[in-house]
Amino acid sequence: MLNTVAIIGRPNVGKSTLFNKLTKSRSAIVSNFSGLTKDRNYGLLSIGDSKTFLIDTGGIDSSKKESIENEISEQAWIAVDESSLVLFVIDGSEELTNLDSEILDNLRKRNKKFI
């Protein structure tokens, strides 16, 4: 069984760009507009003989009350539950936001290993 790594974070922090770079693909749509990734997207990271499944997710945003945003967030948390490790992506050009802190707290409560 291969290890599985979920890539999560708030909307538009570069999750899909990172996923495409690591999987050497263009399977994740990348744009300046948030909300394009709606479901989990699976890919394979290969380094030498080592292989790992990666899961690209939509942005987690608990401040949005619309059902589609709730579904996107739920899909991201399902990916976290499926994974053995989480890559928590933040925007390094900005201060840590309340939403970033909320996601971090939720990761800690789930007792998941994360980077």
Where are these regions (language model features)?
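Conserved G1/Walker A P-loop phosphate-binding module
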Residues: 1-69, 73-80
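Conserved C-terminal guanine-recognition region of P-loop GTPase G domains, centered on the G4
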Residues: 47, 71-115
